Design a protein with these regions (language model features):
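Short Lys/Arg-rich basic patches
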Residues: 1-19, 23-31
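Residue-level marker of intrinsically disordered, low-complexity segments enriched
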Residues: 6-7, 48, 102, 114
């Protein structure tokens, strides 16, 4: 029978005393270790504050919980989630993901009628957040070419000053493969 769980496996090495503490706490509460871990991770990320990657409505929103921002961009569509994260910049998503998103958002080839951020999963209404940019893309095309764009961005980073255009890169790639 197929495993229908949408959960993913997380593997990490931790100090032996933390593992023992986790096991003892789970036993004492009659809970599964995985549930306690999920709660600890979510609470830990909730406690981390970041510079708000959106336009804040109020001055007190200049710093927000990481999970508030993450929840605003989350999608089970991995490409959309990564595009949203990268569109918020390198401080939020790291350099490579930001470069991929910047390339896609700035290339007419990927333009379309899909609003990348939409209502930010309700955060526009709840918090008054607005993204700094409102990219509109052809999402099926972005989904199809996302891995190629990731390769292209890595290629450009590793082969400076050589900078072929995206179409030239795709042609080089198809001839090599």
């Amino acid at each position: 029978m197929a495993n229908r769980s949408k959960k993913v496996v997380l593997s990490a090495r931790v100090e032996p005393y933390l593992k023992a503490a986790l096991e003892l706490f789970a036993t004492s509460r009659n809970e599964k270790i995985v549930k306690i871990l999920e709660t600890c991770v979510e609470n830990g990320l909730n406690d981390r504050t970041i510079t708000n990657p959106f336009k804040p409505r109020h001055k007190d929103q200049e710093k927000i919980s990481f999970m508030v921002a993450f929840t605003a961009i989350w999608s089970e569509n991995e490409t959309l989630y990564k595009l949203r994260a990268g569109s918020l910049g390198s401080d939020f998503a790291g350099e490579e993901l930001a470069m991929v998103a910047m390339f896609i958002n700035g290339k007419k080839y990927f333009a379309g009628d899909f609003d990348v951020f939409g209502d930010l999963n309700g955060s526009v209404e709840t918090f008054g957040f607005k993204p700094h940019m409102q990219p509109m893309v052809n999402l099926p095309l972005v989904e199809e070419e996302w891995p190629i764009v990731e390769e292209y961005v890595r290629f450009l980073a590793n082969n400076k000053p050589f900078e072929p255009g995206y179409e030239d890169y795709k042609r080089m790639r198809s001839k090599a493969g």
